[in-house]
Structures are given as C-alpha cells and as structure tokens.
C-alpha cells in the first residue's frame, strides 16, 4: 500500500489563528484537534480494526490517504450535494472555525483531496483504476452519551475506474462489503436501500455481531454529478464508510463508547 499524506497551508494558517484566540469556542476546537487520532495509535482497538480491514487482500493495491481535519465548506458540503440550507451545514451540528472553514464532519471528503493530488492526477491522465482508503477523526456536535461522541473516527474507501474499462455495479460493491463482514467480523449481514447525497443507488449494511443486528456502514455507487463537481469525468465506482467506534463497541461487547 502507498501512503499519501495531504497537507493544507490554509489549515496551518487557521490553526495559528486559533492559537491567538482566547474565546471559549477557539479553546474548545483546539482541544478537539489536539485529541489523539486513535486510528493511528498502536494498541488502540480503533487502530486494530482499521488495520484489519485495510489488510484484506482486495485492498492490497489501495492507497492510504491522510487529509486535513479543517476543510472549506464548499469542499465538504457543496461538492457533495449538500447546498446552503442543508441540515449538515447547521452551526448546531458542525464546528465552524470561521464562516468558510469547519472541522470535517464526514470521511468521504477525502475524495476531493485524493483526486487533486499530483500523483493521482497523472494516474487519471493514464486512465488507471484507482482505489483509496482514508480513516481518522471526524467532528460533529452530537450530545455525548453511551453511544455517541462529538469526536470520533471514521473509515472510508472507494474504487473508481474509467467508464471505457469497466462499469462497476451494486453487486461489485456488495461483494467488497461482504468480504469485510465475513472475514473481519465473521458475521451474517444484510443490505437495505438508503439515500446519501453523494451515492446512488445507496445502501446500508447491517451485521449480526454477538447476537445483535447493528447498522454497520453506508455505501453506494458514486454519483457522477459529484465526480463532475470535483472535475472528474469518464469514471465510475463505489464507495463506503462507517464509524469505527460503533463496530469496535459491538465486537468487544462494550456498553459505553467512552471505554474505548
């Protein structure tokens, strides 16, 4: 696997501006940013889970992508079909650094950064099939309780290919997800239709873990309109993403997310 770490000069500037601020919101955001990324801490159940999934043979040629944690709203929301007025953009749901930049709320934002990396742009010119995995912290203004945290970890992946090479189907996606359920969790699973702004058709998968059916992940075929928003045409593919804490809790039979 090839690791691609994408840094943002704008993120560095915004972090410096936070350091100069003394208001409550700035202090709170700084504290969240300083929290460890458990998906990269050896020995953490979160890291163990992300490593086990990444190690599946079907992901052998996928890139591992690390992206900024402070992202512009037009990238996080507009490009993903969440326009002005969408509930996800509410300041009651999302941590705003300023009017145009927020703490990332969902993992698929890595698509944009990945597609704009110089190496990947060159591979697109060569009409290569591309696969990538991204995991790390995300931030939402959820009320903290036994099953929710406002800072948690997501794992996402996608596979895209030129239209003239292959047309990826829902069955291809479900085969990939079945691989995770059976080989990582040794679990029974089932799919049902859902809706997401950036995939169509979309599916959620439930898995039976330790005798309980739990919502495991969201997935779907990548919307062509979203790819066009990011400047890419002539490609198609699948994507999925899920919260690592939810699955770690289920597999370890933990009663409270705060025990992780």
Features from the language model and the residues they span:
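TRNA-recognition modules of translation machinery and tRNA-sensing kinases, especially anticodon-binding
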Residues: 2-260
């Amino acid at each position: 696997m090839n690791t691609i770490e994408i840094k943002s000069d704008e993120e560095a500037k915004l972090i410096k501006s936070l350091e100069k601020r003394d208001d409550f919101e700035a202090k709170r955001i700084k504290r969240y940013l300083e929290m460890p990324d458990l998906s990269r801490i050896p020995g953490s159940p979160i890291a163990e889970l992300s490593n086990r999934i990444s190690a599946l043979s079907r992901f052998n040629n996928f890139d591992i992508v690390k992206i900024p944690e402070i992202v512009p709203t037009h990238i996080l929301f507009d490009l993903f079909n969440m326009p002005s007025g969408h509930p996800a953009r509410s300041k009651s749901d999302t941590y705003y650094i300023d009017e145009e930049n927020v703490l990332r709320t969902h993992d698929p934002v890595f698509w944009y950064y990945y597609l704009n990396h110089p190496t990947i742009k060159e591979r697109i010119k060569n009409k290569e099939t591309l696969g990538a995995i991204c995991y790390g912290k995300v931030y939402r203004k959820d009320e903290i309780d036994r099953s929710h945290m406002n800072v948690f970890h997501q794992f996402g992946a996608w596979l895209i290919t030129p239209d003239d090479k292959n047309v990826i189907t829902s069955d291809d996606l479900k085969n990939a997800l079945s691989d995770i359920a059976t080989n990582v969790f040794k679990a029974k699973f089932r799919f049902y239709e859902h809706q997401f702004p950036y995939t169509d058709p979309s599916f959620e998968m439930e898995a039976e873990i330790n005798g309980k059916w739990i919502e495991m992940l969201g997935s779907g075929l990548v919307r062509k309109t979203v790819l066009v928003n990011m400047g890419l045409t002539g490609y198609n593919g699948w994507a999925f993403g899920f919260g690592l804490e939810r699955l770690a809790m289920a597999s370890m039979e933990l009663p409270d997310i705060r025990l992780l």
